Regions:
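A short gly/proline-enriched turn/hairpin at secondary-structure junctions
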Residues: 56-59
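Unchanged
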Residues: 62-151
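Short, solvent-exposed loop/turn segments that connect beta-strands within catalytic domains
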Residues: 38-44, 101-104
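Short connector loops at helix/strand junctions that flank enzyme active sites
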Residues: 27-30, 40, 52, 106-109
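Charged phosphate-binding loop/patch that engages nucleotide di/tri-phosphates or the phosphate backbone
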Residues: 13, 142-169
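Short, acidic/hydrophobic/Gly-rich beta-strand patch recurrent on exposed beta strands
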Residues: 46-49
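Acidic, metal-coordinating catalytic segment for phosphate/diphosphate chemistry
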Residues: 2-38
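Conserved beta-strand and immediately adjacent loop positions that scaffold enzyme active sites
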Residues: 31, 44, 131
Length: 169
C-alpha cells in the first residue's frame, strides 16, 4: 500500500481547477483625487479606507445615462458627504481586471482632479468604510494603496502647484 506523502494535500489544492471563464464583464467607473488648501496653504488630499483597510480615493460605478465626470462628483458626495466641489482636470484612466467566479471583470476608472469647496471638515463616510481622512499631500502619496492612483495623484499635484487648474469640458 502506497503511503501518502506530506504534499498530497497541497497537490490537491494546487491542482484544483477553477471554472472556465464564461463571460467578460466591463465595469466603467469614475472617481476623483479630492484636494483642499489647509490653513497653512498646504495641499491636503482626501482618502478613504476601504473594508480591507486600503487607503484609496472615492470612486464608483457609472450609472446609465451618466458621464464619468458626473459619476465622479456623485460618488465623492456619496462616499464622503462633501456637497460643494469643483471638478477640474481629467487626470487619466486606470484599467484593472480581476476574476469573479466564472467571469473576467474589466474595470476602467476615469479619474478627475476635484477641489473641495465650502465646509470640508464635515465628512460623512459610508458604512462600509473603515476610515476617511484629509492627509498632507506627501503623506497621502505614502498611504495610497494603488500605484496607478498614486501616479495620477502626482499628476494632479503637479497641476495644483503649477496653477494649471483649467475646467474640463
Amino acid at each position: 500500500m502506497k503511503r501518502p506523502t506530506p504534499f498530497e494535500g497541497i497537490k490537491k489544492f494546487v491542482n484544483k481547477r477553477r471554472p472556465a471563464i464564461s463571460e467578460v464583464v466591463r465595469e466603467p467607473t469614475a472617481g476623483g483625487v479630492v484636494f483642499r488648501r489647509a490653513k497653512n496653504n498646504e495641499v491636503e488630499i482626501l482618502l478613504i479606507q476601504d473594508a480591507k483597510d486600503r487607503w484609496t480615493i472615492p470612486k464608483g460605478h457609472i450609472e446609465e445615462g451618466e458621464s464619468s465626470k458626473e459619476t465622479a462628483q456623485r460618488e465623492i458626495t456619496e462616499e464622503t458627504g462633501l456637497k460643494k466641489m469643483n471638478v477640474l482636470n481629467w487626470l487619466g484612466k486606470i484599467n484593472f481586471r480581476y476574476r469573479r467566479t466564472n467571469s473576467l471583470v474589466l474595470m476602467t476608472t476615469e479619474i478627475y482632479l476635484v477641489q473641495a469647496m465650502g465646509d470640508t471638515n464635515e465628512l460623512q463616510p459610508e458604512e462600509w468604510m473603515n476610515g476617511i481622512q484629509w492627509f498632507p499631500a506627501a503623506e497621502a502619496l505614502d498611504k495610497i494603496a494603488y500605484e496607478d492612483i498614486e501616479k495620477l495623484m502626482l499628476i494632479g499635484l503637479k497641476k495644483i502647484r503649477s496653477g494649471n487648474l483649467g475646467i474640463t469640458a
